[in-house]
């Protein structure tokens, strides 16, 4: 089958798949260390989803009041509901201040205080004095367009350091041999050619799989391509049951209203005009962690206190804030609310509803970004030649629930750490090991089979079934009955993939084929998500079980590892959470009941 296609071969020291914040930070970091670096991306780098991040990036700089990275670590462990690995969390929080100063040095135009320091705003779950003090102003912001500012800056650095970009190339599958990754195969959408990239190290920085759901703040490109490739390579994914619902997606549109809006003083109200978060989180109120706020909103709506004709959403008030603050600190939000909700935020509230926002789960890695698997008693056996970073990965610093503004931090800290590790492991221009023809043949055969699929189901039709099922059966609140039904439905939908129909057989800009390949990635991740959720009989972080309302540390303080066998069945395994720190500079945070 390989002879039927024009396959172009490349050799690089490292290949990064994805050009968002994590991918770019990793790519130019590796190029800076002298490694011949390629970056494959299915869309132009500055259109990557990092560009949509609004509120900010967390670091204990102490510009707006006393702060300490140890307090940041405590908040992150608590936010994770004690499913986060404390060695990785320590690494991230300790390196956060330097990461911000590095970004500033690269040219990120952060907002400023009157003294000229980087402006920091409060964000949900961020506190001082190990949760005993007031809210911490820890989130560094570039107005409400922080991701945009960071992504453009990182792209400039990548060009400066001569990263070689392959733009609008769709990554199909990993080249795996003897349990090692030797490269990746991609399809050039512009001319239809297939490309075999050989590399000593492949970095998956492909983002999350938010588009497995019907309503998500994610771009339509967020199809979890790295996770799909990992599953097909026989690797497990970790903690896939933990899907974050952001409290404030615009009602009916799903577009994000940043948590920074509440950080600047915005608040939620129900149909009675009551600031209901005071009942659910008396101390943190509207700035409790995202899972807590999303559940509170869902309960208010369920109990008949929603607003609007159908009483199916709540209001976010910003109209008490001065127009000057809205213009200087939340300019993008004012514009988004006007376009997608028809609301003038200076005069009226924004209709909002919890919306799928982030995947805490992903490809398991250590804090160097190296992909790890369970091998006998060794839970951290490294997969040679493969790394994963950003939302595609599960380090796990976010555990069962991510704190707002920790995701941009995750991207730059672990993007940098992956580059440092690669430079340590790889000698520039060292020879590549040979690959077997059948390894490439297998990848091309799968691609060709999808391209010539001539069944009865349209890709868009099958995708919509999956999205609606995930939205209704793996949502904010879950029960065994609903999850089991959802697992059966997603299994059936996934089996329908072999009956899809591709109308366009061409190789140049074939969006029908792109969407089919993306759907394959989404279906595998949807499947392991719902099966992992059905198996976890407790409530922890974003995984809220109505039939098991309490956290159960004795039985369930462990990471889920999920894979799919050749028969299409989900196989679940578990490994312990790391409850020890990396150094003696900080003590581990013991599990307690999580209250805000």
Swiss-Prot record:
Principal place of residence: membrane
Protein name: Succinate dehydrogenase flavoprotein subunit
Species whose genome carries this gene: Rickettsia conorii (strain ATCC VR-613 / Malish 7)
Enzyme Commission numbers on file: 1.3.5.1
Residue numbers binding substrate: 246, 258, 357, 402
Annotated active site: 290
GO cellular component: plasma membrane
Any one GO molecular function term: electron transfer activity
Catalytic reaction list: a quinone + succinate = fumarate + a quinol
Cofactors named for this entry: FAD
Pathway: Carbohydrate metabolism; tricarboxylic acid cycle; fumarate from succinate (bacterial route): step 1/1
InterPro entries cross-referenced by the UniProt entry: FAD-dep_OxRdtase_2_FAD-bd, FAD/NAD-bd_sf, FRD_SDH_FAD_BS, Fum_R/Succ_DH_flav-like_C_sf, Fum_Rdtase/Succ_DH_flav-like_C, SdhA/FrdA/AprA, Succ_DH/fumarate_Rdtase_cat_sf, Succ_DH_flav_su_fwd
Subcellular location: Cell inner membrane
Residues annotated with Tele-8alpha-FAD histidine modification: 49
Subunit structure: Part of an enzyme complex containing four subunits: a flavoprotein, an iron-sulfur, cytochrome b-556, and a hydrophobic anchor protein.
Record's bilayer topology term: Peripheral membrane protein
Residues bound to FAD: 18-23, 41-56, 225, 391, 407-408
Record GO biological process: electron transport chain; tricarboxylic acid cycle
Keyword terms of this UniProt record: Cell inner membrane, Cell membrane, Electron transport, FAD, Flavoprotein, Membrane, Oxidoreductase, Transport, Tricarboxylic acid cycle
């Amino acid at each position: 089958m390989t002879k039927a296609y024009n396959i172009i071969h490349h050799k690089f020291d490292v290949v990064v798949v994805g050009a968002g914040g994590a991918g770019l930070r990793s790519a130019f970091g590796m190029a800076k260390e002298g490694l011949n670096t390629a970056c494959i991306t299915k869309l132009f780098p500055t259109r990557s989803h990092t560009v949509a991040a609004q509120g900010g990036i967390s670091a204990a700089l102490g510009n707006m009041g006393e702060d300490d990275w140890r307090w940041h670590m405590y908040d992150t462990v608590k936010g994770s509901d004690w499913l986060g690995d404390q060695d990785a969390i320590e690494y991230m929080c300790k390196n956060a201040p330097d990461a911000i100063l590095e970004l500033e040095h690269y040219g990120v135009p952060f907002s400023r205080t009157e003294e000229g320091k980087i402006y920091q705003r409060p964000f949900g779950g961020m506190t001082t004095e190990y949760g005993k003090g007031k809210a911490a102003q820890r989130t560094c912001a570039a107005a409400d367009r922080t991701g945009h500012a960071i992504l453009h800056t990182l792209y400039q650095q990548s060009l400066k350091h001569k990263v070689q970009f392959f733009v609008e190339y769709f990554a199909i599958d990993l080249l795996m041999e003897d349990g090692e990754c030797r490269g990746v195969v991609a399809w050039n959408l512009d001319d239809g050619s297939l490309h075999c990239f050989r590399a000593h190290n492949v970095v998956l920085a492909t983002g999350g799989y938010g588009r497995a759901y019907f309503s998500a703040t994610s771009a339509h490109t967020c199809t979890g391509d790295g996770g799909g490739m990992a599953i097909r390579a026989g690797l497990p994914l970790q903690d896939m049951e933990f899907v974050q619902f952001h409290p404030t997606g615009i009602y009916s549109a799903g577009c994000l209203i940043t948590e920074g809006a509440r950080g600047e003083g915005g608040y939620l109200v129900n149909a009675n005009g009551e600031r209901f978060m005071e009942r659910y989180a008396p101390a943190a109120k509207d700035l409790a962690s995202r899972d807590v706020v999303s559940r509170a909103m869902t309960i208010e709506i369920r109990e008949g206190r929603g607003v609007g004709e159908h009483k199916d959403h709540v209001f976010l008030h910003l109209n008490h804030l001065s127009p000057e603050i809205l213009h200087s600190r939340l300019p993008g939000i004012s514009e988004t609310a006007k376009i997608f909700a028809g609301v003038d935020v200076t005069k009226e509230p924004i209709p909002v509803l919890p919306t799928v926002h982030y995947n805490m789960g992903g490809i398991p890695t250590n804090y160097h970004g190296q992909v790890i698997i369970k091998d006998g008693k060794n839970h951290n056996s490294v997969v040679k030649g493969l790394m994963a970073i950003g939302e595609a990965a599960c380090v796990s610093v976010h555990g069962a629930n991510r704190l707002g503004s920790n995701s941009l931090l995750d991207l730059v800290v672990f993007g940098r750490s992956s580059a440092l590790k690669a430079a340590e492991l790889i000698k520039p221009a060292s020879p590549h090991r040979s690959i077997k023809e059948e390894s490439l043949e297998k990848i091309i055969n799968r691609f060709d089979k999808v391209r010539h699929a001539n069944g009865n189901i349209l890709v868009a039709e099958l995708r919509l079934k999956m999205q609606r099922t995930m939205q209704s059966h793996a949502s904010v609140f879950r029960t065994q009955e609903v999850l089991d039904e959802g697992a059966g439905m997603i299994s059936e939908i996934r089996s329908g993939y072999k009956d899809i129909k591709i109308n366009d057989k061409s190789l140049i800009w074939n969006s029908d084929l792109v969407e089919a390949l993306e759907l394959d990635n989404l279906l595998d991740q949807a499947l392991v998500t719902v099966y992992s959720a059905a198996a976890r009989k407790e409530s922890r972080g974003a995984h809220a079980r109505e039939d098991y309302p309490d956290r159960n540390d004795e039985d369930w303080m462990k990471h889920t590892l999920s894979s799919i066998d050749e028969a299409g069945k989900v196989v679940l395994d578990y490994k312990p959470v790391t409850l020890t720190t990396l150094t003696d500079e900080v003590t581990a945070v013991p599990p307690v009941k999580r209250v805000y």
